[in-house]
Amino acid sequence: MIDENHPMRAAGNFFGRRHGKPLRPHQSNLFEDLLPRLKLDLATPAPQDLRSLFEAPVETVRMEIGFGGGEHLHHESGRYPQSGFIGVEPFINGMAKMLAALDQAPRPNLRLYDEDATAVLDWLPDASLAGIDLFYPDPWHKRRHWKRRFVSDANLDRFARVLKPGAKFRFASDIEHYVNWTLQHCRRHAAFDWQAESPADWNDAYEGWPGTRYEAKAFHEGRRAAYLTFIRR
């Protein structure tokens, strides 16, 4: 039976491989001990007030989809202790890096999920997020794989449902085709407004941006990034 309140799930995953290098024993232990304490339980209904998900008192809740090695998410959750953060990363080695960082510097305002981000989006209450970040997602270069790109009409509908009016959807990529793809999809979606006024609005990194390992590699290889910000109407 289809839930009429939420968009249908795509037939395929939006992410590629889930595992890379074998985990070290300490990393495996973190998956067994730390991740269960931080992982969202989607088997239970989401609280209407998401602030109750966190150990620390928070004022708003943001989400980062596909946080990679967790550089930005760990940085932001430390920089804004008054905000709650939900981080989603299905790639096991990326999650391992994040868990290692949290083992050294815990974040009581952070929860994690290691599977499909659309499951979290469909679990969240309406108008419950103050922002969604999607940085350097898999571009799925081949045309036949474009349907796997996370930016899609269905997922923008999901974003529109869970974002509060005035909340931001931020997208960064070093792949020009995916940047243009995202601009086209968001500008034709009734729920999102792109307010850029000059090239600096997409050429300059976000305020306080810490950079990521992937981004550094892209720059080293001669690629430039675009940093887009869309406002939920």
UniProtKB/Swiss-Prot annotation:
Chain sites annotated for binding substrate: K142, D174, T212, R213, Y214, E215
GO molecular function: tRNA (guanine(46)-N7)-methyltransferase activity
Domain of life: Bacteria
Chain sites annotated for binding S-adenosyl-L-methionine: E64, E89, D116, D138
Catalytic center residues: D138
EC number per UniProt: 2.1.1.33
Cellular component, GO, one term: tRNA methyltransferase complex
Keywords assigned by UniProt, alphabetized: Methyltransferase, S-adenosyl-L-methionine, Transferase, tRNA processing
Disordered: annotated segments: 1-22
Family, as annotated: Belongs to the class I-like SAM-binding methyltransferase superfamily. TrmB family.
Protein function: Catalyzes the formation of N(7)-methylguanine at position 46 (m7G46) in tRNA.
Name by which UniProt lists this protein: tRNA (guanine-N(7)-)-methyltransferase
Organism from which the protein derives: Brucella abortus (strain 2308)
UniProt gene name: trmB
